[in-house]
Design a protein with these regions (language model features):
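Enriched for short, Lys/Arg-rich terminal
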Residues: 1, 72-107
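Basic, Lys/Arg-enriched alpha-helical interface segments
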Residues: 1-69, 88, 105-107
Length: 107
């Protein structure tokens, strides 16, 4: 594990993304798959991004320095977790969960 444990929280948009993922699969007749993806994405975000070293090494998506929006690619790079890290407060805000095949999100 890394240097410090960070507090990770999901924004409203990130929570809505998880709901949309579950709905997407439910509409395709695979509700269990959607629930599993949503649960696994949430767990991965809170586990991985609570580690300061992991959070610091996310690829910069937009901005720079303390205001940089970073991304963590997960599940064989199929999903992207966009987040902001505030080193001073020790908090990470998960902004969006995004499938890699979709157009770039507006953040």
């Amino acid at each position: 594990m890394g240097k410090a444990t960070l507090q990770v929280f999901l924004t409203t948009a990130a929570r809505e993304d998880l709901d949309e993922i579950a709905i997407y699969w439910m509409e395709r007749g695979e509700p269990e798959r959607g629930e599993k993806y949503a649960e696994d994405l949430h767990r991965t975000a809170t586990t991985e991004l609570s580690d300061e070293d992991t959070a610091l090494h996310g690829k910069t998506f937009a901005g720079d320095g303390a205001t940089a929006i970073r991304e963590l690619r997960v599940f064989k790079r199929a999903y992207r977790i966009f987040y902001l890290m505030d080193e001073q407060s020790g908090r990470v805000a998960v902004l969006r969960f995004w499938h890699s095949r979709r157009d770039e999100p507006e953040l």
